[in-house]
Amino acid sequence: MARLLTSSSALRWGAVSSSQSVGRAYSSGSPDTEYVQRSIVPTMHFQKSLPRLPIPKLEDTIKRYLNAQRPLLDDVQFKKTEQLALNFQNGVGKQLHEELVQQDKQNKHTSYISGPWFDMYLCARESIVLNFNPFISFTPDPRPDYNRQLIRATNMTVSAMRFLKTMRAGYLEPEIFHLNPAKSDTLTFRKLIRFVPSSLSWYGAYMVNAYPLDMSQYFRLFNGTRIPKPNRDELWTDEKGRHLLVLRKGNFYVFDVIDKDGNIVKASEIQAHLQHILSDTTPAPEFPLGYLTSEERNTWAVLRQKLLNNGNQEALAKVDSAVFCLCLDDFPVEDRVSLSHNMLHGSGLNRWFDKSFSIIMTEDGTAAVNFEHSWGDGVAVLRFQNEVFKDSTQRPAISPESCSAPVDSSKAVQRLHFNLDDSLKAAIANAKEKFDTSVNALSIATMEFKKGGKELLKTQKLSPDAVSQLSFQMAFLRQYGKTTATYESCSTAAFKHGRTETVRPASIYTKKCSEAFVMHPSKHSPAELRSMLQDCSKYHGQLTKEAAMGQGFDRHLFALRYLASSKGLSLPEIYQDASYAQINHNVLSTSTLTSPAVQLGGFAPVVPDGFGVGYGVHDDWIGCNVSSYQTRDVRQFVECVHQSLDDIFTVLQDKPIK
């Protein structure tokens, strides 16, 4: 599964540009209290002229697929897989590919992967908790007083509404990846490009090495939810909703944050309403409704219908149409592991996992976004976090000295009541039991390597992302004695309706290098080991560039399989091969994220015997946040990652590995 958005090299399109925007000056003058910025270039200015996601040549896809299979298979297995792949290329695969190309030509408004990818997410019947929803936590406000729960919750809510208004008014700066910022990330460029018609604007940006990114996912950020339905869920958005949903102790509250004229409600009133909720002594409900959103999706679909039939239509409509969900937890965070557990799943009592996103805030003001993954890949979420962090810390709506407005919050704030019959109560108790069992099986460990980071690696002409990925390969080999299927998500937002492509970090180069470092370090000089590091870095850079340009193999093979299935054809043999199942059983699922607004990100493993590896390469350190279930030892794995990085940085000092 594509999890968090990758951002570690110059060709990790989405997050790089987003993280640049954190420190970027506003585009035209100072924004007023209703907006985070007022871009002179309309938000969707480039959308119409974005290039289309290319469908790779079938022979390139098969070649890349076999290259990725090589380190995972012995000679006999590889020969069989190679034969099946070539048969596919010259037989049914060729016909399917030609049909896919024709379909794509008839659907120029979108990409060939968009529909199948939505289906993949929305048809999945597993719980979205752990299996799909990731979290990204905010960096603390640099001023401790502003991290008080009421202060930060108020400021983030106001900044979130400023972002909503900015986006809907078309004042949000278009998302652009600047290869030459000195030339294109300038007021002069913006003044010129705004007059280029939308049908040509992308080409104008391209001329100065600037790459506008797809922003089609952004509209689903607010007022949205995933609605459980039999066999395939639906995404639902109602932009008319003006209220915020707040959860505290499993109770649901709503109040307006946008007034009837479309203005943001005064910050002092929002503060008063949140204070009212924080002071409410209503106990946690005996049967907290939020657990139902963690259910298997067909089960939840039946139960939701039962809720509607029980007279809860109005209350559920309020939940679904809220601008977003704010979860106020009544305990502090102890450390990064407890932070990760709480933001990824929590106790389940105080969550509604179906909303497009929730801001979760603990008693000490630690905040994170937990988001539903089907509607987007983190591109919009990361931009939202960057802008909200910047706005709430640089232009906070209230200060610790601010007084709440003298308003009657008991009238403005509505606590939602749900009618539950005995069968619904039993279903909630059952959902809670399943939820507790699944989250109790999850372990998380974090690691910080302090001997170097991005800056040192760049002086050595090594890709920081390649080195991180290599450390995971070495760690797995050290712990389990073999190379395993590895997935790294890479955004294809450089294309219209692009989603993600997979980088396959396990290669013949990483296998050779890992074996040399882990099994036979004394047989190789530091110079020989350094040469292997360079080979790994070069090849990883090539894979990353190909993926970002839509030239991986995973999405193409996925789309061809989807097409065969939709035509009712028998499954081609390439997909029945045990090696195909193995490479898609992603034991190492990895995703990287680096931004000044982000403290930590994480997700659960995508297979029962896997690791979920969130990582970040910073200027002078490397960190990772890893999850696993009980079949794997996650603490030992992060120790092995640390050992691997230690060995790599030792070699970079031209010293032998001890």
From Swiss-Prot:
Its main location: mitochondrion. Its EC number is 2.3.1.21. It catalyses: (R)-carnitine + hexadecanoyl-CoA = O-hexadecanoyl-(R)-carnitine + CoA; octanoyl-CoA + (R)-carnitine = O-octanoyl-(R)-carnitine + CoA; decanoyl-CoA + (R)-carnitine = O-decanoyl-(R)-carnitine + CoA; dodecanoyl-CoA + (R)-carnitine = O-dodecanoyl-R-carnitine + CoA. Keywords: Acyltransferase, Fatty acid metabolism, Lipid metabolism, Membrane, Mitochondrion, Mitochondrion inner membrane, Transferase, Transit peptide, Transport. CoA binds at G453, K454, E455, L456, L457, K458, T459, Q460, K461, L462, S463, P464, D465. Pathway: Lipid metabolism; fatty acid beta-oxidation. GO terms for molecular function: carnitine O-octanoyltransferase activity; carnitine O-palmitoyltransferase activity. This is Carnitine O-palmitoyltransferase 2, mitochondrial.
